[in-house]
Regions:
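Alpha/beta-hydrolase fold catalytic core
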Residues: 385-392, 400
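Substrate-binding/active-site clefts of carbohydrate-active enzymes
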Residues: 142, 149-212, 218-388
Length: 413
């Protein structure tokens, strides 16, 4: 006669059997945003999207696609020698659609997101579909060449940054006389003289390499060689473009006051220099396009630089005249709302502005409280993809870390 088991014993037996399943093959779990796992990849609002997920063959019990509010059980639709494939169909709304996956194998539950397998849900790494957002066909699979201009090629020595031209991050600017000399450990103020004329002279070389897209690191006015601390979004840095009026003095040894760096002030604020540099860039883009290549710019819109004309911590624009007071100098500045200040009684020379990762050379842009800033940046995005520049697109720096123009607004601009 067969032995009868209590409910408790049956539960223990069931748990034992579940635990005896093959070990979960975490390395087999996979999904991404390509057409193999999301079809269509760039849906419109109201369109149905098939989302797929891969597992090891006969290795899991259940796969769910998860949103903030719901778990949707996925159906096994296909298998091959090594893998099973699960799918579910979702209808897109108007808003971004965020999702991740949960996988059950016996008593083991794991999650899968853009960063892979995890024991816990990670909202920051969810997959995202933005209905109505698409990327141009020319960008898909294109051969892209990234250029940090200062380190590419010096085509015009007349625009080189000079030694002692100005002072930045506890060091004076330095012109590197030997192109082959290795940069120092802290080289933000060391300049090798690469410029846009150098890029123009090497376009044939780039074309022969098979380059289809040139992606420029930031080109706008900035005191550093990397230029992720932008001083003026409206103009190409004359040190990369054209210096047609070159007047003023270098800093005296030991001087740190950039309002006295009159050579630098003239170079980066003189209207003739700025307009000539913008015009040269427009010509360069036309020549790049004539060779069948595209151009992408680097959009650094999360933060700017302490030299920026909206803040003007260095009093470069205040000393030059013809510019509004920066928000560092005056609470009445028209740019006051562009930055978040912790001390409302800190003016003049209010150092309490919020910096990205607390770096005072990288003031955080305050989109949350400034509709004017929001509109200004959208205008900048539109300016450089319009006549006479006709840039083909933007790469957005640290775009996940700031509240800024929405993806849909950026696309429209």
């Amino acid at each position: 006669m067969a032995k009868e088991h209590s409910v408790y014993e049956l539960n223990r037996i069931q748990q034992y059997i579940m635990q005896m399943r093959p070990v979960l093959k975490k390395e087999a779990l996979f999904s991404d945003g390509t057409k193999d796992y999301r079809n269509p990849t760039e849906p419109e609002a109201g369109e149905k999207v098939t989302i797929r997920f891969r597992t090891g063959k006969n290795n899991v019990d259940i796969v769910w696609l998860c949103t903030d509010c719901e778990h949707y059980k996925m159906k096994k639709t296909e298998s091959d020698r090594e893998f099973d494939y699960y799918a579910v169909e979702m209808t897109m709304g108007e808003e971004p659609f965020y999702y991740y996956f949960e996988v059950a194998s016996g008593l083991l539950h794991v999650f899968f997101d853009r960063y892979g397998v995890s024991k816990e849900r990670r909202d920051a790494y969810r997959f995202c579909i933005i209905p109505g957002f698409s990327t141009p066909e020319w960008s898909k699979g294109a051969v892209m060449y990234q250029i940090l201009v200062d380190r590419f090629y010096n085509g015009d020595p007349a625009n080189d940054v000079l030694t002692d031209e100005y002072y930045y991050i506890k060091t004076p600017s330095k012109k590197m006389e030997d192109w082959n000399q290795c940069p120092s450990d802290f080289s933000v103020g060391e300049f090798y003289g690469g410029d846009l004329e150098g890029v123009r002279q090497k376009l044939g070389y780039l074309q022969n390499l098979g380059v289809e897209v040139i992606y420029f690191n930031p080109l706008f006015v900035s005191p550093s060689n990397h230029k992720y601390d932008i001083q003026d979004y409206d103009h190409i840095d004359p040190h990369y473009g054209k210096i047609v009026v070159d007047e003023g003095e270098l800093l005296q040894s030991g001087t740190t006051d950039n309002s006295k760096a009159t050579r630098y002030v003239n170079r980066v604020t003189n209207r003739e220099n700025l307009e000539a540099s913008n015009a040269f860039f427009a010509e360069l883009v036309r020549e790049i396009h004539a060779r069948g290549m595209k151009v992408i710019l680097d959009g650094v819109f999360n933060h700017c630089g302490s030299f920026n004309k909206w803040l003007d911590r260095e009093k470069i624009y205040h000393a030059n005249g013809g510019y509004e007071d920066g928000a560092f100098l005056s609470k009445e500045s028209p740019y006051r709302s562009f930055f978040g200040f912790r001390d409302e009684n800190g003016w003049p020379d209010n150092t309490s502005y919020e910096g990205w990762w607390d770096y005072d050379t990288l003031p955080k842009l305050n989109y949350e409280d400034s509709e004017e800033l929001y509109d200004y940046i959208l205008g900048i995005a539109a300016k450089w993809v319009s006549a006479p520049y006709y840039v083909d697109g933007w790469r957005l720096d640290v775009c996940l870390l700031y509240t800024s123009p929405s993806p849909r607004d950026r696309q429209k601009s």
